[in-house]
From Swiss-Prot:
Polar residues bias (residue ranges): 107-118
A cellular component term, taken from the record's GO annotations: membrane
Top-level division of the source organism's lineage: Eukaryota
Taxonomic lineage from the root: Eukaryota, Metazoa, Chordata, Craniata, Vertebrata
Region (Disordered): 19-47, 103-122, 161-181
Keywords assigned by UniProt, alphabetized: Membrane, Phosphoprotein, Signal, Transmembrane, Transmembrane helix
Parts of the chain on the Extracellular side: 23-74
InterPro entries (UniProt xref): TMEM154 (IPR028064), TMEM154-like (IPR053087)
Name of this protein: Transmembrane protein 154
Residue intervals on the Cytoplasmic side: 96-181
Species in which this protein is naturally found: Mus musculus
Protein's gene: Tmem154
Subcellular localization: Membrane
Length: 181
């Protein structure tokens, strides 16, 4: 940053120096005489400083161009890529909703649904027949069947575990201590 500032100060100094050199009449009145050698040396110095200043300004412009390029890359990374990702996501959602609405809606299956119709296939035709209450078991009937199964399994397992069965518990069996007395 100091090189561009120094180049700018040098360029301004040269500009003011040339404007004061343009007044030859003032230099004659001041009592100073400029010889041609001093004048040519002065011009050589000015041209050398001008080329150095131009090179410094060119470097400054090149570094600004590099900064602009990096700013463009940052802009692309920070704005353009997330925006493109958002557009792709939106496009995918729209396609999914389009295909979902285009697909024919299927009838829910009779199992687990509250549908009052049951499908039967006769030949090549499918008929929808209403489900009547006597055709479906109630919750209580299902629970009773499960309880019966459990009780039967308990009776079978009782023989192996040395637990008294229901029949043994119901029979009045005198205890051995009662027989001795």
């Amino acid at each position: 940053m100091t090189v561009p500032c120094a180049a700018l100060v040098l360029a301004l100094g040269l500009a003011f120096g040339q404007s004061s050199q343009g007044n030859d009449e003032e230099s004659e009145y001041s009592g100073q005489s400029i010889t041609e050698e001093e004048n040519s040396e002065d011009e050589t110095t000015r041209s050398a400083l001008a080329t150095v200043t131009t090179e410094a300004l060119a470097e400054n412009v090149n570094s600004t161009h590099t900064n602009d390029t990096s700013n463009q890359v940052e802009f692309i990374l920070m704005v353009a890529i997330p925006l493109a990702a958002l557009l792709i996501l939106l496009f995918m959602v729209l396609i999914a909703t389009y295909f979902k609405s285009k697909r024919p809606k299927q009838e829910p299956s009779s199992q687990g649904s509250q549908s009052a119709l049951q499908t039967h296939e006769l030949g090549g035709e499918t008929l929808k027949v209403p489900i009547f209450e006597e055709d479906t078991p109630s919750v209580m009937e299902i629970e009773m069947e499960e309880l019966d199964k459990w009780m039967n399994s308990m009776n079978r397992n009782a023989d192996y575990e040395c637990l008294p069965t229901l029949k043994e518990e119901k029979e009045p069996n005198p205890s051995p201590s009662d027989n001795e007395s």
